[in-house]
Structures are given as structure tokens and as C-alpha cells.
Amino acid sequence: MGKLIDIPIVVESGQKYKTSQGVTAIKDGIKSSGQDHERLPKPKWLRIVNHTTPAYSQVKEQVQKHRLATVCEEAKCPNISECWSHGTATIMLMGAVCTRACRFCSVDTGNPHGWLDAEEPENTAETVALMNLDYVVLTSVNRDDLPDGGANHYAKTIRAIKKRSPRTKVEALTPDFQGSERDVAVLLDSGVDVFAQNVETVERLTHPVRDNRAGYQQTLNVLAFAKKYRPDVLTKTSLMLGLGETDEEIIRTMDDLRTHHVDILTLGQYLQPTKNHLPIARYVTPETFSELRQIGLKKGFFEVASGPLVRSSYRADRVFKRDNLGLDV
């Protein structure tokens, strides 16, 4: 009798499957609709350049060794090769299954039923130390199944990083914790340097773009509370463009963000991750991104990173240092 060979099961986008923890999840977050919307042709100026360097391999090795999830992989970020080749990565905490199903996001969705990796805070801190990072971005899936939304897990991870690598700056791109100021305060007391939460889109499009449990005003309120509670911590948010918003709505959103004391803004082009996700309504030109950056700076943002391939944590270390000026993003 021949030797049995394990054949990996390929899960199609939109299909249900079970994770290694036994959690039922939907691949890429959105169920298959059976429809394939006509896609806008990609403009010539929107090109992703792949970088492969020894640093890329080192980051990948550390991520795999410590069983870390990264938003770079899970959200199919177009900048993964560039960022990893520069020795930086955005680490995704609390697993790779989100309790929400935003219609722009390709992270798998499901209910982890309270599962957490107790070793993750120390593993993450060890990885950051081994990579000798000056700046690290932590993000996570939404964990509405946890009483605190994962705030204490975040705080443990940040404290572990600061203990091993006291000079490392830590940015936390967090879920909204259902608007709980108590949970947000737990995270802010951990020693975090930048508190980020994404408003994602303009107010009019919030319902069709984001999960129903998210809210435009709720995100603004959380960001405002963070600044009031810890004025020394920079606050940050991100907008995707190309979902059907107008330039006037973008500028109005900037005004709302400044009213709620948000320091840093990133603007990037929405790219449809699978056929099951929201279609692209328009491609915003590099010239428009540049104009919007200047408008944002005039409104008083500490920094505005704006470009077709800009994502929430793209070049976050440079943005933190206000070293984004003149970059071709």
C-alpha cells in the first residue's frame, strides 16, 4: 500500500471553513454572492512594485517562527514587500478571525468564542526585540466576543514590548471597543505612543461600507476621548477613497476629525480584495491625493500621508517623525 499524502484543502473566498482552533469562519470575510461586478480598469499609474531583500526573508521567518498574524498578509496589503523589505511589519493580535464583516475588508470573519493565545504578548515582544525595531505597529481583528474587546490583551502586549525594548515606539491601530471609554483607557495606560482607530469612510457611506456595529460618530468619540484622557499620545485615523464619496465629503470629514482633536490622517485608494467585496467607484489620481494632503495640513493635522497605496500603518515611523514631506507616496 502506498504512503498516504496530505493534500492541503484550498478554501475558496466566501466559503465557510474551520480554523485550527475549531472556529467556524468565512474566508476573506464576505460570503460569496455568486455575482461578479464589472471592475474598473486599473490606471497605468497604479502599479505595485515588489521588493525582495534579505530583510523581507528575515521578517517572514520571525513572523512564522512566533506564529504571529500580520495585517500585511491577512488584509492583502499592497505594500507588504516594501515594508517587509525595510524590516517593518504590522502585527495583528488576537488571531486572524474578526467578529465583524466590513464590506471592504478581506480578513476572515467568525466568532472565536473567547479564544486568545496567552503566549502572544511575550512572543510579540520577543519578535520586536529580535528585529531590533525602532517602531512597531500593532493592530487586531475586532473581538466583540471578549468582555473588554481585547483591551487588556493589547495592554499586556504593549507593556511586554516596552519592557524588552524601552526605546521602541508603539502604535496601536485598534477596534472601537464598542465605544467603551473604560476599555480604551486600559490600552492608553499601557505606554502606547500612538493611538489609531480608523473612521474608514465618510459619514454617508459608513453603513454600506462598515459593519453595522461600527459607527462614524462612535469612532470620532473614541478618538476624542483618547486625546482628552492622554494628551501626550498622538491620535490617528485613516480614510479609504474611491468608495463613492465626493471630495467635498472628504474635506468635511477632515473638519470633523480636527474638531475631535485627531493629530494624524492617512488617505489611500480603496482596492477591491475579492469579487465579493464592494466594487471600486473611482480611482483617485495622485494629483488629487497631493491636493488633499495640503488641505489637511492647512487644517492643522500634525501630518497627512496621502497617496494611492497609502494604508493606515504605511511608513508609520516616518509619519510619526513628520518625515513624510516630499515622499513619493
Curated annotation (Swiss-Prot):
Domain Radical SAM core: 83-303
EC number of the protein: 2.8.1.8
Cofactors required: [4Fe-4S] cluster
Gene3D superfamilies attached to this UniProt entry: Aldolase class I
Known catalytic reactions: [[Fe-S] cluster scaffold protein carrying a second [4Fe-4S](2+) cluster] + N(6)-octanoyl-L-lysyl-[protein] + 2 oxidized [2Fe-2S]-[ferredoxin] + 2 S-adenosyl-L-methionine + 4 H(+) = [[Fe-S] cluster scaffold protein] + N(6)-[(R)-dihydrolipoyl]-L-lysyl-[protein] + 4 Fe(3+) + 2 hydrogen sulfide + 2 5'-deoxyadenosine + 2 L-methionine + 2 reduced [2Fe-2S]-[ferredoxin]
GO molecular function: 4 iron, 4 sulfur cluster binding; lipoate synthase activity; metal ion binding
Top-level division of the source organism's lineage: Bacteria
Annotated binding of [4Fe-4S] cluster 1, by residue: 72, 77, 83, 313
Pathway(s) per entry: Protein modification; protein lipoylation via endogenous pathway; protein N(6)-(lipoyl)lysine from octanoyl-[acyl-carrier-protein]: step 2/2
Cofactor note: Binds 2 [4Fe-4S] clusters per subunit. One cluster is coordinated with 3 cysteines and an exchangeable S-adenosyl-L-methionine.
Matching InterPro entries: Aldolase_TIM (IPR013785), Elp3/MiaA/NifB-like_rSAM (IPR006638), Lipoyl_synth (IPR003698), rSAM (IPR007197)
Location(s) in or outside the cell: Cytoplasm
One GO location term (cellular component): cytoplasm
PROSITE patterns xref list: RADICAL_SAM
Keyword vocabulary terms for this entry: 4Fe-4S, Cytoplasm, Iron, Iron-sulfur, Metal-binding, S-adenosyl-L-methionine, Transferase
One family name in Pfam for this protein: Radical_SAM
Binding site for [4Fe-4S] cluster 2: 98, 102, 105
PANTHER family membership: LIPOYL SYNTHASE, LIPOYL SYNTHASE, MITOCHONDRIAL
Family listed: Belongs to the radical SAM superfamily. Lipoyl synthase family.
Protein name listed in UniProt: Lipoyl synthase
